[in-house]
């Protein structure tokens, strides 16, 4: 038997995917997230991101609505965000 190369995904591409990002309270956090996402999804605009502080004010949460074409693009965005120094968690 041959191994099936196509993996089954629960996400239908292309789509607009909501990325949840948690990170440090920092004046550059929102712009850093936006710039990082734009490396892999250049059409992402400032109005695609919303931020809010955590309940205790220790972290900032951001949701970015990103148009992604395939799983590889989404994976690259996740990797870029998780490697950023201001980002703690990406969901």
From Swiss-Prot:
UniProt-listed InterPro entries: UPF0250_YbeD-like (IPR007454), YbeD-like_sf (IPR027471)
Top-level taxon of origin: Bacteria
Coiled coil: none
Family in the record: Belongs to the UPF0250 family.
Record protein name field: UPF0250 protein NMB1218
